[in-house]
């Protein structure tokens, strides 16, 4: 089957929160495609620290320098979102070998659901290979400094979450 539109890529994730690793991947993908759509998944089952709207805002702020990058929230099956965006490429990041098994399984499932779309894996720059949103959330929740892992706007957002939970 032919590729839908190989000039448009979707980079999906929960982005709870967006990290410097995510930003690095978009920075490297943006020159490769005419259009990159960062799809921020609703994912209520993951119990996100930040609401979908706030995660979209933070990603938009972090990626504003790219004219060909847009950020959109979605609450549908990823395959439907990719088709709705007219994308021919699904971007995924691989931080370590430990990510591979899960990502391979997801790529195989997506190949069945959207056979016209290719999954492309990018590895992070070495200085970002250990960063994950879950680690950033945990460090922030415990009052640690996450400024080396996320943009300043995300540091502020996580601090607000921590302070609001402390008042409860």
UniProtKB/Swiss-Prot annotation:
Q: In which pathway does it act?
A: Cofactor biosynthesis; coenzyme A biosynthesis; CoA from (R)-pantothenate: step 4/5
Give the keywords, sorted.
Answer: ATP-binding, Coenzyme A biosynthesis, Cytoplasm, Magnesium, Nucleotide-binding, Nucleotidyltransferase, Transferase
Query: Which reactions appear under catalytic activity for this entry?
Result: (R)-4'-phosphopantetheine + ATP + H(+) = 3'-dephospho-CoA + diphosphate
Q: What are this entry's molecular-function GO terms?
A: ATP binding; pantetheine-phosphate adenylyltransferase activity
Q: Does the keyword Chaperone apply?
A: no
* Residues annotated as site: Transition state stabilizer: 22
Please list the cofactors this protein needs: Mg(2+)
Recorded hits in Gene3D superfamilies, A to Z, give: HUPs
Question: Does the keyword field hold Cytoplasm?
Answer: yes
Gene Ontology terms describing biological process: coenzyme A biosynthetic process
Annotated residues for binding of substrate: 14, 46, 78, 92
Gene Ontology CC entries for this record: cytoplasm
The protein's location, in the record's own words, is: Cytoplasm
Q: What class of enzyme is it?
A: transferase
Binding residue positions for ATP: 14-15, 22, 93-95, 103, 128-134
Enzyme Commission number(s) of this protein: 2.7.7.3
One Pfam match, given by its short name, reads: CTP_transf_like
Q: How does it assemble?
A: Homohexamer.
Family per UniProt? Belongs to the bacterial CoaD family.
Function, please? Reversibly transfers an adenylyl group from ATP to 4'-phosphopantetheine, yielding dephospho-CoA (dPCoA) and pyrophosphate.
Specify the protein name. Phosphopantetheine adenylyltransferase
**Organism whose genome encodes this protein:** Xanthomonas campestris pv. campestris (strain ATCC 33913 / DSM 3586 / NCPPB 528 / LMG 568 / P 25)
**Lineage, uppermost ranks:** Bacteria, Pseudomonadati, Pseudomonadota, Gammaproteobacteria, Lysobacterales
Q: What gene makes this protein? A: coaD
């Amino acid at each position: 089957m032919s590729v839908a539109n190989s000039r448009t890529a979707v980079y999906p994730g929960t982005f709870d929160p967006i990290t410097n690793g995510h930003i690095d991947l978009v920075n490297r993908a943006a020159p490769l495609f005419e259009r990159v759509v960062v799809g921020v998944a609703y994912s209520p089952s993951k119990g996100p620290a930040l609401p979908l709207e706030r995660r979209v805002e933070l990603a938009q702020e972090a990626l504003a320098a790219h004219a060909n990058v847009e950020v959109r929230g979605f609450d549908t099956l990823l395959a439907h979102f990719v088709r709705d965006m007219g994308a021919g490429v699904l971007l995924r990041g691989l931080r370590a070998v430990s990510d591979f098994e899960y990502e391979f399984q997801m790529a195989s499932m997506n190949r069945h659901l959207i056979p016209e779309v290719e999954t492309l894996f990018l590895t992070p720059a070495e200085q970002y290979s250990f960063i994950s949103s879950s680690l950033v959330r945990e460090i922030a929740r415990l009052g640690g400094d996450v400024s080396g892992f996320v943009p300043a706007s995300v540091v502020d957002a996580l601090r607000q979450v921590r302070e609001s939970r402390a008042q409860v």
